[in-house]
């Protein structure tokens, strides 16, 4: 049996397990537990035990100069790294810190993954000191979007995450919520939303008091050169979905065509959002995302990522921000 198969769990199966567990216990069963201290080198230093890590450039930028004029721009933190290795180390530290804070507060850490190069950027979590320090048993893992293909298919975000991250860390199988790939795109999206609702009822997933949508602890997003995030593509009607938590598309401009995706109200209700964007091919979309000249009629999906609470943190490299004149 492959590593992926050994830890496989559909959202429906995992939800059922959670439901049975909670039938004799209140939702408050997910409670804060004593926080295991992270090594001091993890929280107080920018130096990896293996190699020096250069601090990133911190900026809040717009093409016309540092600093945006809107409230949304003020909630963007732009981190720029000289090398991908430094970005990966910083992203691991950021994720580990948020995990520790969530576990200390609620006894669980809910995180949503994307596909693409994001998983490679998370690889440091599988190494010391993060592998030992993070309370993996408290993690609950979701997918921001997924292709409706078998779990062992080359296009599966589940397979990508399993191969690069999840098979290398001790997260309980019942807390890894894959889609049911035997269903249609619509059926898989509906079932995934039902799963989320069950986990909200069980007290595993919080609800935003501001939006009424699920409030995951961390939403980890990538971005395509066209400015798409999740499976929310420019000009597609699902971009404007504001009632459903999880939706679907059958006509993705990138293969495979059938996918499920979190909607913007769910994405933007997260406690924390990280956008991991690298490469010169994405510089145009980054430039537009930080532009003060925006109208609602031509927004790229990445421009619609706007947290209701907290700060949106961009993890970038210099090629990705090369069109920002203030950098």
Curated annotation (Swiss-Prot):
Keyword Plastid: yes
Protein's GO biological process: carbohydrate metabolic process; pentose-phosphate shunt, oxidative branch
Gene3D superfamilies on file: 3.40.50.1360
Region (Disordered): 1-66
A UniProt-annotated Pfam family: Glucosamine_iso
Assigned keywords, A-Z: Chloroplast, Hydrolase, Plastid, Transit peptide
Stretch forming the transit peptide: 1-71
Reaction catalyzed: 6-phospho-D-glucono-1,5-lactone + H2O = 6-phospho-D-gluconate + H(+)
Biased composition (Low complexity): 1-29, 43-66
Pathway: Carbohydrate degradation; pentose phosphate pathway; D-ribulose 5-phosphate from D-glucose 6-phosphate (oxidative stage): step 2/3
EC number assigned by the record: 3.1.1.31
Enzyme class, UniProt record, top EC level: hydrolase
Family: Belongs to the glucosamine/galactosamine-6-phosphate isomerase family. 6-phosphogluconolactonase subfamily.
Function description: Hydrolysis of 6-phosphogluconolactone to 6-phosphogluconate.
Full protein name: Probable 6-phosphogluconolactonase 3, chloroplastic
Species this chain originates from: Oryza sativa subsp. japonica
């Amino acid at each position: 049996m492959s590593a992926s198969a050994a830890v496989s769990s559909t959202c429906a199966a995992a939800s059922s397990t959670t439901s049975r567990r909670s039938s004799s216990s209140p939702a408050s069963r997910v409670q804060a537990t004593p926080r295991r201290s992270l090594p001091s080198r993890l929280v107080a230093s920018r130096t990896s035990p293996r190699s020096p890590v250069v601090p990133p450039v911190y900026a809040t930028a717009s093409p016309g100069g540092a600093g945006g004029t809107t409230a949304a721009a003020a909630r963007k933190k732009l981190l720029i790294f000289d090398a991908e290795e430094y970005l990966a180390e910083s992203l691991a530290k950021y994720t580990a810190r948020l995990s520790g804070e969530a576990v200390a507060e609620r006894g669980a850490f809910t995180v949503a993954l994307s596909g693409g190069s994001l998983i490679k950027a998370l690889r440091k979590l599988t190494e010391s000191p993060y592998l030992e320090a993070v309370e993996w048993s408290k993690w609950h893992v979701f997918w921001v979007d997924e292709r409706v293909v078998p779990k062992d298919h080359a296009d599966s975000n589940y397979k990508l995450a399993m191969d690069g991250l999840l098979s290398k860390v001790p997260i309980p199988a019942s807390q890894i919520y894959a889609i049911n790939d035997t269903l249609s795109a619509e059926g898989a999206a509906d079932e995934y939303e039902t799963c989320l609702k069950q986990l909200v009822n069980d007290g595993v997933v919080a609800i935003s008091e501001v939006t009424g949508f699920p409030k995951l602890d961390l939403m980890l997003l990538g971005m395509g050169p066209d400015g798409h995030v999740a499976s929310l593509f420019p000009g597609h009607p699902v971009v404007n979905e504001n009632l459903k938590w999880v939706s679907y598309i059958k006509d993705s401009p990138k293969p495979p065509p059938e996918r499920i995706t979190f909607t913007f109200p769910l994405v933007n209700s997260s406690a924390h959002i990280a956008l991991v964007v690298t490469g010169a091919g994405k510089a145009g979309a980054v430039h537009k995302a930080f532009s003060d000249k925006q109208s609602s009629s031509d927004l790229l999906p990445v421009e619609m990522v706007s947290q209701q609470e907290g700060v949106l943190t961009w993890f970038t490299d210099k090629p990705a921000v090369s069109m920002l004149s203030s950098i």
